[in-house]
């Protein structure tokens, strides 16, 4: 049984963890909404079908599995436009700044970069760049869900409707 001091300490730790999760969800939400702004341009440039919109709309849904190669191509195009990647992989500095621009503090921004870097290293070395990026994105999504940083489907839908 916990004494009063232990109980207070436990409550403080739980509260601080909760407060860390909510702002992180906001960061991921804001990053995602900004990330997809160039989607129409990428679809036009790469002649991608409108069917990939569903993958972007439902990306953070835990039950949605992204398998469409075209979605990987769009993610690569968007990442390039935002200068988050180079020919050799993730641009750590630009990605760190991108996260900070969307509300992340230094710690959260670095954790996002670390997750992306870890996922980049973890995916198989596929010859098809679009499929490799798709696997990278799926890994990142899974890691964000483990941290409970994924924005809810309801919040994302409301934000997307508000932008229309």
Swiss-Prot record:
Whether Signal counts among this entry's keywords is yes
Tissue specificity here reads: Antenna.
What is known about what this protein does?
Answer: This major soluble protein in olfactory sensilla of male moths serves to solubilize the extremely hydrophobic pheromone molecules such as bombykol and to transport pheromone through the aqueous lymph to receptors located on olfactory cilia.
Q: From the UniProt record, report the name of the gene that encodes this protein.
A: PBP
Alphabetized UniProt keyword annotations: Disulfide bond, Pheromone response, Pheromone-binding, Signal, Transport
Disulfide-bonded cysteines = 42-77, 73-130, 119-139
Q: How does it assemble?
A: Monomer and disulfide-linked dimers.
**Any one GO BP annotation for this protein:** response to pheromone
What is the designated name of this protein? Pheromone-binding protein 1
């Amino acid at each position: 049984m916990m004494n009063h001091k232990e109980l207070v300490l436990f409550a403080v730790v739980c509260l601080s963890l909760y407060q860390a999760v909510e702002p992180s969800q906001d960061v991921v939400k804001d990053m995602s909404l900004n990330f997809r702004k160039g989607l129409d341009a990428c679809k036009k440039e790469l002649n991608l079908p409108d069917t990939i919109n569903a993958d972007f709309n439902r990306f953070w849904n835990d039950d949605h599995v992204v398998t469409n190669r075209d979605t990987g191509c769009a993610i690569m195009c968007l990442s390039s436009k935002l200068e988050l990647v180079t020919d050799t992989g993730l641009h750590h500095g630009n990605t760190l700044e991108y996260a900070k621009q969307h509300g992340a503090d230094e710690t959260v921004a670095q954790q996002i970069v670390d997750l992306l870097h870890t996922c980049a290293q973890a995916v198989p070395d596929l010859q098809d760049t679009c499929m490799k990026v798709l696997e990278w994105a799926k890994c990142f999504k899974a890691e964000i869900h483990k941290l409970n940083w994924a924005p809810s489907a309801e919040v994302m839908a409301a934000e997307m409707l508000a932008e229309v």
